[in-house]
Swiss-Prot record:
Mutagenesis / variant outcome for changing residue 258 to T: In strain: Isolate CIN0327M
Record-annotated site: Interaction with the Nucleoprotein-RNA: 274
Outcome of swapping residue 112 to E: In strain: Isolate CIN0309R, Isolate CIN0327M, Isolate CIN0327R and Isolate CIN0331M
Subcellular location: Virion; Host cytoplasm
GO cellular component: host cell cytoplasm; virion component
Biased composition regions of type Acidic residues, renumbered to the chain: 55-69
Gene giving rise to this polypeptide: P
Polar residues compositional bias, start-end: 197-209
Phosphoserine: residues bearing it: 250
Domain free text: The N-terminus is disordered and is involved in binding N(0). The region of interaction with the L polymerase is necessary for transcription. The hinge region is highly variable. The central domain is involved in oligomerization. The C-terminus is basic and essential for binding the N-RNA template.
Entry protein name: Phosphoprotein
Region (Interaction with the Nucleoprotein-RNA and template-binding) residue spans: 268-293
Region (Oligomerization): 106-167
Family: Belongs to the vesiculovirus protein P family.
Length: 293
């Protein structure tokens, strides 16, 4: 009964038959379309089948590559083999490389050879440009100050290795016109010792240069081994005693310094004390008026 009523209600629904027909046609079209979910169709091959064929191709390619590889792997080249290859490719005679030997640093280098009083003060290592300039300026200034001494004449010259010093001794203020032979000085009596005669302020030589004449009284060569005494300033201190040979170190040094023979005994003693490095100590303690025993 209920089915008949439902049927009557649906039957009375407008265009019901057309709607049912369209639904049936839609179902037929859906069944006739090809499946795209992996079923065999005329348009292509399923994806899973393609994946299997791709794997097989890769395996075949890898097998072909393995066939092309050598059956035995050679050993790596040794050091001897590499050296042999390098010797064949490079000509050692075409290249000449010279390395300077590393020398140890020395503070003073003798550069004069047979010439005395010539040496080079080496440049200190690891100096900056400013430090090197200050070092050179200080050394030149010191040499200029020392060069003003009566007994020495110092000249400096900058070189690649350092500063070259040339030291010359100046035994006299002005050379004598006629040097006295050493034989005449050695033949004099040792006890005949006198000091230089003083000149008046207005007395000068007749030469055009106006240089004072050399004193006539000279120190005898025989006095070099005679002991002299410098009296102490303080009565409690002992006097200073020595000889000219000991002050100058040897008879040759004294002979070289006193070539002209124009120095007085006092000047010779002062020069000897300076050579020995005790001048300042002695002049504070003693009177610089030597007397022979």
């Amino acid at each position: 009964m209920e089915d008949s009523q439902l049927y009557q209600a649906l039957k009375n629904y407008p265009k019901l038959q057309d709607t049912l027909d369209s639904i049936e046609n839609l179902e037929d079209d859906t069944k006739s379309e090809p499946s795209e979910c992996g079923s065999p169709t005329e348009r292509g091959i399923p994806s899973y089948y393609l994946a299997e064929e791709l794997d097989e191709c890769e395996e075949e390619d890898s097998e072909e590559d393995d066939d092309n590889l050598p059956t035995e792997i050679p050993d790596p080249p040794t050091v001897d083999m590499l050296e042999a290859i390098m010797e064949d490719e490079i000509d050692d005679t075409a290249y000449q490389v010279h390395f300077e030997a590393k020398q140890t640093w020395k503070p003073v280098i003798e550069t004069g050879g047979n010439e005395r009083g010539k040496f080079t003060l080496s440049v200190p290592q690891n100096l900056s440009a400013l430090q090197l300039l200050q070092w050179e300026t200080g050394i030149h200034a010191l040499a200029e100050r020392l060069g003003g001494c009566r007994l020495l004449q110092i000249s400096t010259r900058g070189t690649r290795d350092g500063i070259e010093f040339t030291v010359r001794e100046t035994p006299c203020v002005s050379p004598a016109s006629d040097p006295i032979p050493s034989t005449s000085r050695s033949s004099s009596i040792a006890s005949n010792v006198s000091t230089r005669q003083t000149e008046s302020p207005g007395s000068k030589s007749n030469t055009s240069l106006g240089i004072p004449e050399a004193p006539a009284n000279l120190i005898d060569m025989g006095a070099i081994d005679k002991e002299f005494i410098l009296a102490a300033i303080s009565p409690s201190d002992p006097p200073y005693k020595n000889t000219l040979r000991n002050l100058f170190g040897s008879g040759d040094s004294f002979e070289q310094y006193n070539q002209t023979g124009i120095y007085s005994l006092k000047e010779l003693v002062i020069a000897g004390l300076k050579r020995k490095g005790i001048y300042n100590r002695i002049r504070i303690r003693c009177h610089l008026e030597p007397q022979f025993n």
